[in-house]
Amino acid sequence: MLICIPDVLSKDEVAEFRRIMDAAEWEDGRSTAGAQSAMVKRNEQLPPDGEAARMLGQRIITALTRNPRFLSAAVPLQIFPPLFNRYTASRGDHFGIHVDNAVRGDPLTGLRIRTDLSMTLFLAEPDTYDGGELVIEDTYGSHEVKLPAGHAVLYPSSSLHMVTPVTRGARVASFFWMQSMIRDAHVRSMIFDLDTAIQSLTERLGRDDPDAVKLTGIYHNLIRQWAEV
């Protein structure tokens, strides 16, 4: 399940993020990579324990908790503190094919999560850089993702993925992981489809429609059956 989530941040918020990030110090992005990923990773990253990363990351989490599409798709239990990276053409930055670590731990908070879902939030407009596509592989093939600034993509952390070399400009983004209340990706996808159908039905017929009420009850009972909290 690969889901695009538009307008997580407004254009004004993106501009503010970029001002703060441009004024911050950056470090080698391999500092947060696993052993295998570090061999194919070349980019820069805001220090995860730095004030800028922590403050901006919390703002992203706050925005996501107000986003109905995200909540419906992810059914999040825990969200890992967002990280921030930059790929520049002058360095030949890229990130080769890899899979994310199954478990992530935050040394500052002690939080440990199972990485069910990964998210990339784009913070540079696609016409400001060449290359830098996020390529995600699944059972249906390869998908290239390059979204407007402020938009995000959500995908299973079990997916092989890569960032192609940046050949002009700079690709700036936030990336992070989350543990879902619904461990099984297939079940989570069906829950999302059901919720989407319920929302469409209630828009047409109203929330008091008997079928909409019944389906909403089924949705919550399925969450009750499958959720791990």
UniProtKB/Swiss-Prot annotation:
The lineage of its organism: Bacteria, Pseudomonadati, Pseudomonadota, Alphaproteobacteria, Hyphomicrobiales. Its cofactor is Fe(2+); L-ascorbate. The keyword Secreted does not apply. Keywords: Dioxygenase, Iron, Metal-binding, Oxidoreductase, Vitamin C. This is PKHD-type hydroxylase BBta_3541. PANTHER family: PKHD-TYPE HYDROXYLASE YBIX. InterPro entries: Oxoglu/Fe-dep_dioxygenase_dom (IPR005123), PKHD_C (IPR041097), PKHD_hydroxylase (IPR023550), Pro_4_hyd_alph (IPR006620), Pro_4_hyd_alph_FE2OG_OXY (IPR044862). Signal peptide: none annotated. It comes from the Bacteria. Fe cation binds at H98, D100, H161. 2-oxoglutarate binds at R171. Residues 78-180 form the Fe2OG dioxygenase domain. Binds 1 Fe(2+) ion per subunit. The keyword Secreted does not apply. Coiled coil: none annotated. Its EC number is 1.14.11.-. One of its GO terms (biological process) is DNA damage response. It holds the Pfam family PKHD_C.
